[in-house]
Amino acid sequence: MKRFSEKVFLQLKMPTEEVPVSDEKRIRLALEALGYEHVNIPLSVMRQLYPLCRNAGFDITVTLVHRETDWAMVRVEAGDTTKEHYALAVDYGSTTIVMELVDMDSGAVIDRVKSVNGQTAYGTDILSRITYTMEAPEHREQIQKATVKTFNSLLVQLAENTGIDAAKCPVMI
């Protein structure tokens, strides 16, 4: 079974006039040589390749997220950052939300934070909240904003406690 995400350090060859291969193609070839055959590279990541590859001397780390049939490259970083491989595990309860920062290589929980689910302001149980959202279209937005506010608060707490920004977590489970 493949993991949810992987960080792969690549030491790419410098481009030459004799082998005019794009940075994207060089990355794809290096990943294919390691067994990652179907990698989707979105435009947002492609835009980062130049000048990052050159500034890093073509020593880069790519973060891949496994999808059903392929991998998606979600980040590219200078140097070897493979030891900084994190994910978020969330227990989204009706009254309490618990969020853990997990080291994806060791499986260790680095930190755990929890908060009252912000949706409880709109009903103490799920059925009350469903009824509330059906009363008016703007109520759905209020419930959604309460959820986002709670999640953002927990992400900030994790970053403050550990010094690890949630942006370094390619996966939330």
Per-region residue spans from a language model:
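Nucleotide/phosphate-binding catalytic cleft detector across ATP-hydrolyzing
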Residues: 1-89, 94, 106, 140-148, ...
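Extended, hydrophobic alpha-helical segments in both membrane/secreted and soluble proteins
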Residues: 95-99, 109, 151
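Short glycine-rich, Thr/Ser-proximal phosphate-binding strand/loop in the N-terminal lobe
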Residues: 101-141
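N-terminal catalytic scaffold of extracellular/periplasmic and nuclease hydrolases
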Residues: 133, 149-153
